[in-house]
A protein has these predicted regions:
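Active-site-proximal alpha-helix that buttresses catalytic centers in soluble enzyme cores
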Residues: 1-120
Length: 120
């Protein structure tokens, strides 16, 4: 079974998480047969390892991690690969892969341009 993890930075203010929760709700409404979990780099739970473990308990065998970051900064270039590899070592029966940061996708950038245009 395939699944997705939406991976964010995390923040001290719990309200920062609200858009991520909405993303999960949208995903579940549109893809009810594909599990999705949130995971955060720091300051929020669950961690990437906790999310992978949760999906593992549900019988998931393939996980795509989607970094919900605007670009490939130090966390995604340096910290994220180490975390992903540690998860792979702890869960050798799961195939883990990752997409680029969502902000590098042209459709995401266009959605931001469209959002700005609607605000004018």
């Amino acid at each position: 079974m395939k699944a997705m993890i939406l991976f964010g930075h995390g923040a001290r203010d719990s309200r920062w998480r609200e858009p991520f929760d909405r993303l999960v709700q949208l995903w579940q409404a549109q893809h009810p047969n594909t599990p999705v979990e949130l995971a955060f780099l720091e300051m929020m739970q669950p961690s990437l390892e906790e999310a992978v473990s949760s999906l593992s308990l549900k019988g998931v065998t393939q996980i795509t991690v989607v970094p919900v970051f605007f670009g490939q900064g130090g966390h995604l270039r340096n910290d994220f690969p180490v975390l992903l590899e540690a998860c792979q070592q702890q869960h050798p029966n799961i195939t883990l892969s990752a997409t680029p940061a969502v902000g590098e996708d042209l459709a995401v950038l266009q959605a931001i341009v469209d959002f700005g245009a609607r605000a004018l």
